[in-house]
């Protein structure tokens, strides 16, 4: 996840080595100043399995060394 400095959006990008995908989403409240983080593919797949509802919301907490998703 990455927040471009000049755009008020949350940018998510992914690649499998051959293809590149990008999604821009509305920046949630309180996310200003959030650093860019790399989330491993296995973690993203586990989240997709747990969050089967398209409308489900998650909380993201980011520090210099960790990213917590709840």
From Swiss-Prot:
GO BP annotation list: DNA strand elongation involved in DNA replication
Keyword vocabulary terms for this entry: Cytoplasm, DNA replication, DNA-binding, DNA-directed DNA polymerase, Nucleotidyltransferase, Transferase
Record has Nucleotidyltransferase as a keyword: yes
Entry's Gene Ontology cellular component terms: cytoplasm; DNA polymerase III complex
Subcellular location(s) per record: Cytoplasm
GO molecular function: 3'-5' exonuclease activity; DNA binding; DNA-directed DNA polymerase activity
Coiled-coil regions, chain positions: none
Main location class: cytoplasm
Pfam short name (any one): DNA_pol3_beta_2
Keyword Cell inner membrane: no
Residue ranges crossing the lipid bilayer per the database entry: none
Protein's job: Confers DNA tethering and processivity to DNA polymerases and other proteins. Acts as a clamp, forming a ring around DNA (a reaction catalyzed by the clamp-loading complex) which diffuses in an ATP-independent manner freely and bidirectionally along dsDNA. Initially characterized for its ability to contact the catalytic subunit of DNA polymerase III (Pol III), a complex, multichain enzyme responsible for most of the replicative synthesis in bacteria; Pol III exhibits 3'-5' exonuclease proofreading activity.
Family: Belongs to the beta sliding clamp family.
Assembly: Forms a ring-shaped head-to-tail homodimer around DNA which binds and tethers DNA polymerases and other proteins to the DNA. The DNA replisome complex has a single clamp-loading complex (3 tau and 1 each of delta, delta', psi and chi subunits) which binds 3 Pol III cores (1 core on the leading strand and 2 on the lagging strand) each with a beta sliding clamp dimer. Additional proteins in the replisome are other copies of gamma, psi and chi, Ssb, DNA helicase and RNA primase.
Protein name in the entry: Beta sliding clamp
Organism: Rhodobacter capsulatus (Rhodopseudomonas capsulata)
